[in-house]
Amino acid sequence: MRRSKYERPAHLIGNAERPRLTTSAMIASIAGADQPTRPAPFGHALSALAEKDDRVVGLSADLAKYTDLHVFRAAHPDRFYQMGMAEQLLMMSAAGMAREGLQPWVTTYAVFASRRAYDFICLAIAEEMLDVKVVCALPGLTTGYGPSHQATEDIAMFRGMPNLTIIDPCDASEIEQAVPAIAAHEGPVYMRLLRGNVPLVLEEYGYRFELGKAKLLRDGRDTLIISSGLMTMRALEAAEELRKNGIDAGVLHVPTIKPLDEATILAECARQGRLVVVAENHTVIGGLGEAVAATLMRSAVRPAAFRQIGLPDAFLEAGALPTLHDMYGISTTKIVAQIKEWLDE
């Protein structure tokens, strides 16, 4: 029988073994059950910044609660602007405020900033080199709501935009450190945001965020995992599991995607005999992996092998995050299995 063009292919239809999904399952935190977290780190950090800098204002496209800007709204109601579901207006308003000497912090979902408002960010903010900070929740595969909400290609879109700095923090402490750092940077910034109860990961490594700098969190002789955002948390977990299997894995955290810390990346990749793996919460097209690969190709540095772990060049399914992360290979278990397979080649 000929299938209707509106009928989903069989391989995309859920089977009886799949759990029934609830709304709470689809917006669950990325933190593990026993993992320490900190609530709304961006909202608290921006509120603290505003206490010291009266230029700071916050703008939302009807998503203050879901980008943690509600904390700022409660602390500074006279400096909060609700623009409604109008992302183009959101960006143009921020541009106008920046021209008047304010420092606007714009929040929405990453899909809406990259897909709906790209032209306005490009021409009204980036071309004019205005001091606007665009902070966007739900980067990559951090929601189960499907392609309409999963910003799997945002870095690919924004990497080519001149003047724009791109940040992908790993945890709550790094978000708190990144806010004053990018406030001190004059010019447009795009920051991917982990929201809600955000894991605490980096404090035990004595880590301090520096704009434009990559940091080696863990050394390893067998393989080097280069990562950003939540994938640094996964990379550290994977490195510990690999250690139990006799595999020594290093982790290089790259929170600034643009400008890329090429010197540190090349220095680490130059060490002989190591498999280099780039792990990212983003499509393998146009993100950190391809940025690192291009850096290596422009240099004389050649690692023993180079591989990517990331999301496929496809529109992703809806569902519970643990299920989706396993399905698309970015869970800790899948990362460990993939690296072991590559090392056995």
From Swiss-Prot:
Instruction: Provide the cofactor list for this protein.
Output: thiamine diphosphate
Q: Which family does it belong to?
A: Belongs to the transketolase family.
Q: Which PANTHER family match?
A: PYRUVATE DEHYDROGENASE E1 COMPONENT (PTHR43825), TRANSKETOLASE-LIKE PYRIMIDINE-BINDING DOMAIN-CONTAINING PROTEIN (PTHR43825:SF1)
Cited SUPFAM superfamilies: Thiamin diphosphate-binding fold (THDP-binding), TK C-terminal domain-like
Which organism was this protein described from? Sinorhizobium fredii (strain NBRC 101917 / NGR234)
Q: Which UniProt keywords apply?
A: Plasmid, Thiamine pyrophosphate
This protein is called Putative uncharacterized transketolase family protein y4mN
User: Which InterPro entries does this entry report, sorted A to Z?
Assistant: PDH/Transketolase, THDP-binding, Transketo_C/PFOR_II, Transketolase-like_Pyr-bd, Transketolase_C
Record note on cofactor: Binds 1 thiamine pyrophosphate per subunit.
Instruction: Show the Pfam families listed in the entry.
Output: Transket_pyr, Transketolase_C
